[in-house]
Amino acid sequence: MTTFQDKVKALRAHHEELLSRKNEPVEWGNGIYEKYKNLILTAEHTPLEWRYDFDEKSNPYLMQRIMMNATLNSGAIKWNGKYLLVVRVEGADRKSFFAVAESPNGVDNFRFWDEPITMPEDVVPATNIYDMRLTAHEDGYIYGVFCAERHDDDQPGDLSAATATAAIARTKDLVNWERLPDLKTKSQQRNVVLHPEFVDGKYAFYTRPQDGFIDTGSGGGIGWALVDDITHAEIKEEKIINARHYHTIQEVKNGEGPHPIKTDKGWLHLAHGVRGCASGLRYVLYMYMTSLEDPTKVIAEPGGYLLVPEGPEYIGDVMNVVFTNGWIADEDGKVFIYYASSDTRMHVATSTIDRLVDYCMNTPKDDYRTQFSVEKIKALVAKNKQTLSK
């Protein structure tokens, strides 16, 4: 007869096998990055102590008392030699919360810290919080900027009506957080990211103005704004630095991912773009670069997407989606790109700064017409004929 303790032992062994599974790159890639074979985080990776009551008297059937639904959209930072993700964990009750998962190498063996993050409330409590962007700022703090969702009380009869604001918190240890007032803006905001350096002595934000909770409406793309005081942050002026365009991967909306990586050629940016299709909205990742001297000036933008949902990545709670809000650049130039697929689970892809700069600088831009796309392909064919004939 299988005892309660036998079941617990088997459960822990199964969980440890999942956590300790080694990861390796897929065999064939595109030369820009390598995806990895195994998922790095799923709902099943969350600690058993978060889900099970291990008291046989109160839980004789060893049921999950608190179920987890997804691990997604994670901020990332290299801290004390470890690769840390501040994960958006979504429970079965649809409420998201933040929790730190730590890896020794950035690609596998991610383990959650003992408890989720206790995030202090704003003056007006949020119903849901999610999608944190982490920035180790030159002022000495680690900042987390995330979406705070509340019901839109101007529409009392609509239980799906919501508002989105950019919440700001800061920490020195990723355990104890100081909640600052939400970013004050003229419109709703998602996908707000703090630039890692002062610009003209001010804090700089990448923004995404939008008319509604989901629809960007008149919002033109990824914006840029300066703020005098981070403890009472207010955006009075913002300008679009990476716009949306008709019949492109960012036709419907776009948003900054993690904060950009500084290179000797410029700032590397990773973003998401959204277009409509017959099955709904399709989310992909793309890149662009801005000038070191003027971070609002785009100096390179490869045409098309960098990374899309492939195979099983397409399936999940929200289909046909990849999303990122975290990457880590190592001292040796290796880059870890952390992305979620279909709002369900977390993946990693790796590249290098040199490869990503090359990709941005030397991939043809989108000229917005089929004719120009064909001309670029034919030019490459002609170049290859000449090269291969030597």
Where are these regions (language model features)?
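Beta-rich carbohydrate-recognition and catalytic domains
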Residues: 1-73, 77-127, 136-193, 197-252, ...
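Short glycine-rich, acidic/polar surface loops and turns
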Residues: 310-314, 322-327
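Well-ordered alpha/beta subsegment
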Residues: 328-333
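Short, surface-exposed ligand- or partner-binding patches at beta-edge/loop junctions that are enriched
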Residues: 336
